[in-house]
C-alpha cells in the first residue's frame, strides 16, 4: 500500500516502557509498504483456503445483501459490491492523495516528468490490452480486454520496498504516477465499457459536487464535514448514473493540496499550546488542536488518518472477497490453456514491460530528447516489470466482464501475474546488479539532472563547512542548537563524516524562537566563536549541552575552548552574529523549511529518518547520481 515516510526518531529522555516500545515497533511496521504487501498476500492465501475448504460459506458471506436508506430511497448491494464499489473508493482516495502530494512537492513538480509518466502509463495499458485481444481474437472473451490493463498499486509498491536500496527512490514516484494514470484510465474504461447505461442527470450531479469540492478547496475553506458530505454525494450520484463509483475516491483525493507546514502556522500553533498549558480549559484545548491541524496540510492529515485502515483493513478485505478460487487439477489445466488466462498473464507480465519502455523511448525520440525519464532505463524496465502485477482493478473489471468458468480463469491469471511480476522484476534487478559501478549507476539513475530543493546553493565563502572542499556529496542541515532532534542527529552526522571520506557537511541556522527561547542566542554564540576560528568546536559543545544555553553557560564554554572571553562577551552583547543567523533563516524560508533538523543532500531534500542507515543510503544515492553526471 502507499505509505508515507517515517519521520526522524524521537529523542529519548528516559528508558521507554515495554508498551511504548511495542507501540513504536507497530507504528514502524505499519508505515512500510512491505508490511502492507504481506497483509495483502496473507488475505489472498486465506481466500484460497476458505474457497477450497468451504466454498458454499465463502459464496454465502459475500453474496449476502445489505441495505441502507429510508422510505423509498434505498441502496441495496451485496457485501461483495459494498467492498468493491464502496470501501475501495477509500483505497483510490489515498492513491489520489499521494499522487497530489507528489504533484505539489515531489518529482511531478517537473511537468515534463508528469507528461512522460502519463505517456508511460498509457503505453503500459495499451500494449497489454492489445496482447489480450490478439490471444482472444475471434472469441467472445475478447470483450474482457480491460482485465489485462491495470497495475495493482499496493502490490507494486510492496515489491519495490522489498528491493529496497538497490533501486532509486525516484522510481517510487515514477511507479506511483504511472499507477495513478493507470487507475484513472482503468476507471474510465469501467465507466464507458463495463457499466450499465449511463444516466446523464445523475452524472451531472456528480460532476457538480466535484466542482463544488474543487472550488471550496481553491477558496481555502477548511473542514472535513463538507468534503465528506460532498464526496458521498459524488459516490451516490455516480452509482445512480450507472458508473462504478470507485472513481469518486480518486477524483476527490487529487483535489486535496499538499504543502510544507508554514512557519506562521507553526508559530501560531505553539502560541495556542502555551495558552492551553497555562490554562488547560476545554476551549483552549479545542483552539490548540485546531492550531495544530491548521499547521499540517489537509493532504497529509487525511492520508495519516486513512492509510492504516486502507492498508491493513480495506485492501486485505478486498482480496479476501475476490481472490477465492476453487483450485483443482482439471481447473488449473483448463486455466493455463485458456485464452483468458494466457491473455492476462502475457499482457501483464510481458506487455507491461514492452509498453512502459517502448512508450518512453518513443517519447524521447519524438521530442528530440527533451522528454527523458528522471531514472535510468534499467529502472524504467524494473518499473515496467513491477507494474505487471494485476490485482485490485483487474479483479474489478474481471467481475464485470466475465462470469462462470471465464471469471475463474481470469482470477487465476490475475494471481499468476503477481508471481510473474515479482520474478521478472527480481531478474532484471539482479542483471543490473552485475554491471560495473558506473554503468549500474547510469542504468538506475539515468542522465537527467534531478530537481533541486535547496533554494540557496552552498557557498564556501559564506557557509560553515566541515569536510573536504572537493567532496562529491554535500549534506546541508538546517538546525537549532536547542532542538533535541538536532542533538540526536549530531552524533549520526559525525559518524557519517567519519565513514564517508567524500562527504562534506554544512550547518545553517534555523533557531525556532517560539519553542526554543535560547536558540537564537546560542546561534549567535557559535558565530561569535567563528570570529575566533572555533565555530565547529562551539557547534559540537552546544549540541552536547543543550540543556544549558543561558548566557553564563555560553561564556563558560568560551573559556573552556580557550577563546578571548571578553571579546566573545562583547560580540554577543552587540549581536554581531544576528545578521548571519537571519540570512540562514531567510534561506530556510526560500527552501520551504519550517522545522529542524531538515537535511538536504546534494540539493535534494531528505525525507524520512535521520539515523545512520537512512543517511548513508541517501548519501550513496547522491554519490551514484554524481557518477552519472
UniProtKB/Swiss-Prot annotation:
Keyword annotations of the record: Antiport, Cell membrane, Ion transport, Membrane, Sodium, Sodium transport, Transmembrane, Transmembrane helix, Transport
Record's catalysed reaction(s): Na(+)(in) + 2 H(+)(out) = Na(+)(out) + 2 H(+)(in)
Residue ranges of every copy of the Thioredoxin domain listed in the record: 443-624
Annotated region described as Na(+)/H(+) antiporter NhaA, given as residue ranges: 1-442
Any one GO CC term of the record: plasma membrane
Recorded superkingdom: Bacteria
InterPro entries, sorted: Na/H_antiporter_dom_sf, NhaA, Thioredoxin-like_fold, Thioredoxin-like_sf, Thioredoxin_domain
Topology in the lipid bilayer: Multi-pass membrane protein
Transmembrane annotation, as ranges: 35-55, 77-97, 115-135, 144-164, 173-193, 201-221, 241-261, 306-326, 342-362, 382-402, 412-432
Record's subcellular location: Cell membrane
UniProt-listed PROSITE patterns: THIOREDOXIN_2
GO terms assigned for molecular function: sodium:proton antiporter activity
GO terms classed as biological process: regulation of pH
One Pfam family per UniProt: Na_H_antiport_1
Listed PANTHER family: NA(+)_H(+) ANTIPORTER NHAA (PTHR30341:SF0), SODIUM ION/PROTON ANTIPORTER NHAA-RELATED (PTHR30341)
Family: In the N-terminal section; belongs to the NhaA Na(+)/H(+) (TC 2.A.33) antiporter family.
Entry function: Na(+)/H(+) antiporter that extrudes sodium in exchange for external protons.
Protein name: Na(+)/H(+) antiporter NhaA 2
Organism for this UniProt entry: Streptomyces coelicolor (strain ATCC BAA-471 / A3(2) / M145)
Name of encoding gene: nhaA2
